[in-house]
Amino acid sequence: MNKNKIDVKIETKKGSMDEWPEPIVRVQSLAESNLSSLPDRYIKPASLRPTTTEDAPTATNIPIIDLEGLFSEEGLSDDVIMARISEACRGWGFFQVVNHGVKPELMDAARENWREFFHMPVNAKETYSNSPRTYEGYGSRLGVEKGASLDWSDYYFLHLLPHHLKDFNKWPSFPPTIREVIDEYGEELVKLSGRIMRVLSTNLGLKEDKFQEAFGGENIGACLRVNYYPKCPRPELALGLSPHSDPGGMTILLPDDQVFGLQVRKDDTWITVKPHPHAFIVNIGDQIQILSNSTYKSVEHRVIVNSDKERVSLAFFYNPKSDIPIQPLQELVSTHNPPLYPPMTFDQYRLFIRTQGPQGKSHVESHISPR
């Protein structure tokens, strides 16, 4: 049996998912205490630290794809755009989209409402403190391993779908417009995700709605993780978020378009993403890699920090219904192309990152079936 699966069962049996293994320290509080050095828990091993070369923006960037004209009443209507998305999903696992249909004013309002929330006094934010059971609320770590290395970030996690998990009482009530703005923002990103899913299906020669059906039709899951990366006294020693691939289906990121931070691993090189104004960054998650039998790739990425400016980003996750098995689609497997992954529900799959924290691509790769 796979060791990672054993670890997850042990952690769950012990009940350690009900509370954090040690007192939570808010990274924002550390940053605002004018530290001259970095606490040991946030210092990454030398092999994981960003280098000066990797910090600097390069001429290389993830693809930027203009979606204007792609979606019409008659269906998907532009083969050139479709081909660019297909190439990005197979070669990069990441791409930016412009003319995506979400109003720039809504994007700005969403980001600035959350920035205002994180600027609230710590005591006010503690009202929303989370636990590792669901991660819902205000948090500062991933994984429940005692003494584990930590990332230089705080976050807020909330559910948007299914509706029975969407609880406004667990959403911040300040600033006054935040609930209304995030509710509208979530609805718009659910629509955008559904449109992109149609493209992903069609590009594999499948029915437009095949991926959506595999995710549970209208019963999909959607959630939002808002990341706050404070200034860091020694950014060359730390990471805002350790290398990982996203465990869910698809991620749509609203980046901080004033401060670079997201890096994508391409051919063993870390590429610093340069956000295009009012673009979303889309990336393939592990569940779509599994459904496509590894035709589409989830890709390792991380976040670097800096000593001069804070960063705020919003990661929207579009996920399968949590209790249905996800496995390679029958239309994409054959005698010559057997299924690479066994069936597993998303509930089972995401326990790994909730217990172990970010671990590169080790989780999805550990489930590859032996040939």
From Swiss-Prot:
It catalyses: jasmonate + 2-oxoglutarate + O2 = (1R,2R)-12-hydroxyjasmonate + succinate + CO2. Gene3D superfamilies: B-lactam Antibiotic, Isopenicillin N Synthase, Chain. Changing residue 354 to A: Reduces enzymatic activity 2.5-fold. It comes from Arabidopsis thaliana (Mouse-ear cress). Keywords: Dioxygenase, Iron, Jasmonic acid signaling pathway, Metal-binding, Oxidoreductase, Plant defense. It holds the Pfam family DIOX_N. This is Jasmonate-induced oxygenase 2. PANTHER family: OXOGLUTARATE/IRON-DEPENDENT DIOXYGENASE. The gene is JOX2. Disruption phenotype: Constitutive activation of stress-induced jasmonate-dependent responses and increased antifungal resistance to Botrytis cinerea. The quadruple mutant jox1, jox2, jox3 and jox4 exhibit reduced root and shoot growth, delayed flowering, reduced seed production, constitutively elevated jasmonate and jasmonoyl-L-isoleucine levels, and enhanced resistance to the necrotrophic fungal pathogen Botrytis cinerea and the herbivorous caterpillar Mamestra brassicae. No visible phenotype under normal growth conditions, but mutant seedlings have increased tolerance to the cytotoxic compound phenanthrene. Its EC number is 1.14.11.-. Changing residue 317 to Y: Reduces enzymatic activity 2.5-fold. The lineage of its organism: Eukaryota, Viridiplantae, Streptophyta, Embryophyta, Tracheophyta. Fe cation binds at residues 244, 246, 301.
